[in-house]
Structure formats: structure tokens, C-alpha cells
Regions:
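Polysaccharide-binding and catalytic clefts of secreted carbohydrate-active enzymes
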Residues: 1-194, 198-201, 208-209
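Extracytoplasmic/secreted cell-surface and envelope-processing proteins
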Residues: 52-53, 205-207, 236-238, 282-285, ...
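A short helix->loop->beta-strand "cap" motif at the edges of active sites that frequently abuts
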Residues: 154-156, 222-224, 389-394
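Hydrophobic targeting/anchoring helices
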Residues: 159-339, 424-456, 467-471, 475-479, ...
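A short, well-structured beta->alpha microelement
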Residues: 180-186, 343-363
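A conserved amphipathic helix/loop scaffold
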Residues: 254-255, 372-578
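Short acidic/histidine-rich motifs immediately flanking catalytic phosphotransfer sites
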Residues: 363-369
């Protein structure tokens, strides 16, 4: 709605898709004929910054108002509803017709009558348009992938930017404005081998965790690789490119970040490439490349004996629930999805990032499930989720099960959490640890000091179960053991690292550190990146010689050693079992 956008084609247009696929295939055939022996794969780019999300996703304007969008929208409605009567019933509008349906107005898309969530009772058209936009972007990516696959005769890798399901939690207009919540559709394509993104632009600086934008472990479960674009601003970077605020000013700090990033990729089975985003020689220092060479000590044994990354902690996101987030809902999803990767990274144990449907399909096996957006589940999905996570600890974030299909339901929330829930009116979403919470190690208050709607409390939590309280005294964080395992309800948006540590201890998760530290681990390999000055008490869980892989020196015997570390320092270690 911000006027013509000549830079981007309309992905809903069958003409664009046809022509783009044909021309892409022609380019690939030409390159294969002339230079095929030198090419390992193809990485088509398009839309905003080449990353296949709608133009101006991070800004105020709304996409979707081109003529081709409207034609595609009406075709999609016809496929979804079959006839006008079905559409009229769904939209509760006796005057609407598939052939004349209009794109929801900017005012309708910016409205938020239900607060955080779109209300299906009055916003069905807006919800449908959000789903339409996800499918159009995902299907365009898949069609172009097929063109590359066929033109290369199946001999080359096919790569795309897509699936930033954690990163777009910060979008004010709602995450779905991006078009990236069709990740499952893209993962189902046999024509895509690698998905990628930059390292998150949140928490990527010195002392930070450099988190993934996506449900990276679900990408691996789909038998695809996640590729990090490491555009870390080295000490040689100039200008204000994305992430400029986190730039460093020395080669020593640069190398600590680069080693952290490569180490994380190694233990999580990611790929990575160093990207000179400014095109001015960011990596033009042999000392950086010497560090990359030293990282062979971690890469080579993992290549020789690959190990699946199956962490005890799973951070889980549901695409459908994110599509339901309204304009302004980032008051919840920014702290609760985008920023939550900071405390997850610091809690002292490695974590994986997954889609909810992988959990319900029993493809994920964790001791602790952090269910960040399990907000919109029908009865079958709730039963499958409880069955798949039976015996584990579940962290239920913000509004678990609030929508039973299309209807708000406190009973559905109770079924999931085991707590009788109550909806609060005009309460700020801020949680202060109680005396019981402090006994378990909680020190940090968290949430937002502004009112959000809806907001929930555990109405029947006892004082012994209440770990943190809202300003009105009601239970904001509550822990209870039931027949399905431990249930931790967290009402305010966001989490704290000390809360996650307490939950991990309850769940039987192995903690490598008992204080904040960025930890990445897989099998005998551990990468630490210090988030603060001071000694790190490391517990590798088994006896054996602990070795610094970058120097080759033995530094102690496990399972427990103390490492003096400075803020931003990275250590790459292995344990040789005795």
C-alpha cells in the first residue's frame, strides 16, 4: 500500500513464475555446458534483499496490492472454498463472491481487534490472505527449484534463502507479512538441497550466541542442510551494513567471533560461508584464515564420523500459530520468539530449533520442550503433542492451546498445561520471582511492563508451584508434575536463562555450565563462548582427558574443570574418554 514497487515481481503471478523458471533454466543449461565442471550448485535469489520475503517486510508498507496479487488471491480462494456459499459461510459475509473478492484493505490488515492474535470470527479474510501469501512465496521458490533441478539434470545442488521463522518474530506488521511461514511446504520439495540465511542479526556480537534464524534442526530432519551466511562485521568492515552495531575493532575480537561461528556450525552440522557483505575486504587478513585452518581439528573428526545433533532441549515453533499473530503482536513474538534465543543460548546446555509438526510426528526426542508458539491447536494436535512429549518437561509459553481450532478455549489450555487457566484483564505482563522461584535459582524478572491482550495466569497454582508472579499476585510462572511429566507454564512473553536452567535441572538435562555461557556441544565436542568475565565451571558429564582442539594441549581431566575466561573468548574442546 506504499505505492508501486517496481523492484520486485509478484510471486503469485503464473506468468512471472513461468517466465522466471524458463529463463532460469536457460541460464543453468548455458552455465552447465560452458562451466559445469566448476559449479557445485545454484542459488537463485529474489524479492527483498534476494532472500524471498516480501518487499519492505521490516517497514511500514504492506505488500499484496498488485493486479497479479488480486488475480492469484481469487484463484486461491476458489481452490480453498470451491463455491461462493462456502466462502460466505467462512467469512460470515453473504455478499462476498470468489470472482469479486477484494484483497483485505490496509486498515483491516493493520487492525488488531483480538489483541495479539487474529480473531477468526471477524478476521477470516485477513487470515486467509496471510496463508495465501505464505503459499505463494513458498510455491514460487519450489517452482524455481524444480527448474534448476531439471536444467542441471539433477547433478547440482539447489539452494535458497528461506524459512526465517524465528527472525521474523520481530516484525511489527505481523510475522506472516514476510511470506516465510511456508517452511514445511519448502522442506517437502525434493528439488531443494540447502536452505540458508545470514546468522541472526540479533545476539550476534561479541559475547553473544549467534543464533539461527530458522528451525534449523527441522531442516536437517527433512534431509536438507542449513547454510549460515556469516557476514560478521570484522575489524576491517566499514559503513553501516546490517549488524553494524555489533562490529568489533580488533583482529583478536574478530577471530573469537569467527571461531565461535564455525564451531557452532560444526557441532550442529551446518554449513557456512564467510561473506564480505560490504565488498571492501572484510576478510582480507591471513590471521582470520589461519583460524579457519585450525578449525580442521573439529571439522575433520566430525566429517570422518558424523554425529547427528540431538540436544536435550528443543525450542519449538508452530507456523500456523505465527500466521495468526496480528499487527502489533510483536509485543509478544519479539521477546517470545526473536529475543528468546538469547537466554536459550546462555542457559548452559545446547538447544535445537524445530517445527511443531516434527514434534507431533515423534521425530524429535528431547528431555525438555520449549513450546514457544503452541497457541493454535485442534484436539487431534493437542493429543498428538502430549503423546509425543510424554514423560518430558514442557515449557508452555504465553498462550498454549488458546485457540482450539478457531475458538478461544481455556479448557484446551488446561488440557495442555495441566493448570486451570484464567484470563487477566488490564494486567502488565511482568513476572517477578517468588520465594519459591528464588529457591530454585530464579533471579531475573522478565516480560514486558506494558499490558498485552490476551494474558493468562495459572489460576490453581499453589504457592509451592508458583515460581514467579504478576504485579497482581497471580501465578505468571508455575511448575507442576502430572501424569505426562513436568509442566512449566510461562505467561509473560519471553524467558530468562536462570528460569531455563532451573527447568533443565528438573528435566534431567545435562548442564555444561551452571551460569550464563554460550554453549554448543555434540558428543565429545564442546564450544564455549563467554558471555561474561570470570571462570567457567565446565562439566562434560564423563571422565577423560579434556583437550583444547585449537592448540592440541590437554587442559584437564573430566568430568569437571574450571576454565578462566574473558568476555567474548571462545574455547573449542574435546573429551577423550578413558
Amino acid at each position: 500500500d506504499g505505492g508501486p514497487q517496481p523492484r520486485d515481481a509478484v510471486v503469485a503471478s503464473p506468468v512471472f513464475r513461468r517466465d522466471a523458471a524458463a529463463n532460469l533454466a536457460a541460464i543453468v543449461r548455458h552455465l552447465e555446458q560452458r562451466f559445469g565442471d566448476s559449479i557445485i550448485g545454484y542459488h537463485p535469489c529474489g524479492q527483498n534483499t534476494g532472500e524471498w520475503f516480501y518487499h519492505d517486510t521490516w517497514e511500514a508498507p504492506l505488500s499484496g496490492y498488485a493486479k497479479s496479487d488480486l488475480l492469484g488471491w481469487r484463484k486461491w480462494l476458489g481452490q480453498r472454498y470451491s463455491n461462493d456459499a462456502a466462502l460466505q459461510a467462512a467469512w460470515k459475509n453473504p455478499n462476498v463472491a470468489i470472482s469479486t473478492a477484494e484483497t483485505p484493505t490496509p486498515a483491516a490488515r493493520r487492525a488488531a481487534p483480538g489483541g495479539t492474535f487474529r480473531d477468526p470470527a471477524v478476521e477470516r479474510a485477513v487470515l486467509d490472505f496471510s496463508r495465501f501469501q505464505q503459499e505463494m512465496m513458498a510455491d514460487c521458490v519450489c517452482q524455481l527449484a524444480r527448474a534448476v533441478r531439471e536444467a542441471s539434470q539433477g547433478r547440482k545442488l539447489v539452494l535458497f534463502f528461506y524459512g526465517y521463522v524465528f527472525e521474523f518474530g520481530a516484525i511489527h506488521n505481523g510475522p506472516a507479512i514476510s511470506g516465510h511461514y511456508g517452511l514445511r511446504r519448502v522442506l517437502s520439495s525434493p528439488d531443494i538441497d540447502v536452505l540458508c540465511s545470514p546468522i541472526s542479526y540479533f545476539d550476534r556480537g561479541l559475547g553473544h550466541s549467534a543464533p539461527a534464524m530458522t528451525a534449523a534442526e527441522s531442516v536437517a530432519l527433512a534431509k536438507k542442510m542449513w547454510l549460515y551466511e556469516d557476514d560478521t562485521r570484522t575489524y576491517l568492515a566499514t559503513g553501516k551494513t546490517p549488524g553494524w552495531e555489533d562490529g568489533v575493532d580488533t583482529i583478536e575480537k574478530t577471530n573469537q567471533e569467527l571461531v565461535r561461528n564455525v564451531g557452532q556450525c560444526a557441532v550442529r552440522n551446518f554449513a557456512t560461508w564467510w561473506m564480505d557483505l560490504g565488498m571492501t575486504g572484510w576478510f582480507n587478513d591471513r590471521r582470520m584464515w589461519a583460524e579457519m585452518a585450525r578449525m580442521r581439528a573439529l571439522d575433520e573428526p566430525l566429517l570422518a564420523e558424523p554425529q547427528a545433533f540431538t540436544p536435550d532441549v528443543a525450542a519449538v515453533i508452530d507456523e500456523e500459530s505465527m500466521i495468526r499473530v496480528a499487527t502489533g503482536g510483536n509485543a509478544v513474538t519479539s521477546p517470545g520468539v526473536y529475543e528468546v534465543r538469547r537466554p536459550l543460548g546462555r542457559m548452559g546446555a545446547p538447544y535445537g530449533q524445530y517445527l511443531l509438526d516434527d514434534v507431533t510426528a515423534k521425530r524429535v526426542h528431547a528431555k525438555m520442550y520449549v513450546l514457544l508458539t503452541a497457541w493454535s491447536l485442534n484436539a487431534k494436535q493437542r493429543e498428538a503433542l502430549l503423546d509425543a512429549t510424554d514423560g518430558s518437561l514442557k515449557v508452555w509459553c504465553y498462550a498454549p492451546g488458546y485457540y482450539d481450532g478457531d475458538e478461544p478455549s481455556l479448557d484446551a489450555m488446561t488440557q495442555l498445561t495441566g493448570f486451570r487457566m484464567k484470563k487477566l484483564a488490564k494486567s502488565v505482563a511482568w513476572a517477578e520471582p517468588t520465594a519459591r522461584g528464588k529457591q530454585l535459582g530464579l533471579q531475573t524478572a522478565f516480560g514486558t511492563k506494558s499490558p498485552i491482550s490476551p494474558l493468562f495466569a495459572a489460576a490453581d497454582a499453589t504457592p509451592e508451584e508458583t515460581l514467579a508472579a504478576y504485579p497482581d499476585g497471580s501465578a505468571a510462572v508455575a511448575l507442576r508434575k502430572n501424569a505426562k511429566g513436568w509442566s512449566l507454564f510461562v505467561g509473560p512473553p519471553g524467558l530468562a536463562s536462570d528460569l531455563l536452567r532451573a527447568a533443565a535441572k528438573t528435566a534431567g538435562v545435562h548442564l555444561y555450565t551452571q551460569a550464563d555461557c554460550n554453549v554448543y556441544a555434540n558428543g565429545p565436542y564442546v564450544v564455549l563462548h563467554a558471555s561474561q568475565d570470570g571462570p567457567v565451571k565446565l562439566d562434560v558429564a564423563s571422565p577423560g582427558v579434556i583437550r583444547d582442539l585449537l592448540t592440541g594441549q590437554a587442559i584437564g581431566r573430566g568430568p569437571k574443570i574450571v576454565l578462566p575466561m574473558k568476555f567474548g573468548e571462545t574455547r573449542v574442546l574435546s573429551t577423550q574418554a578413558e
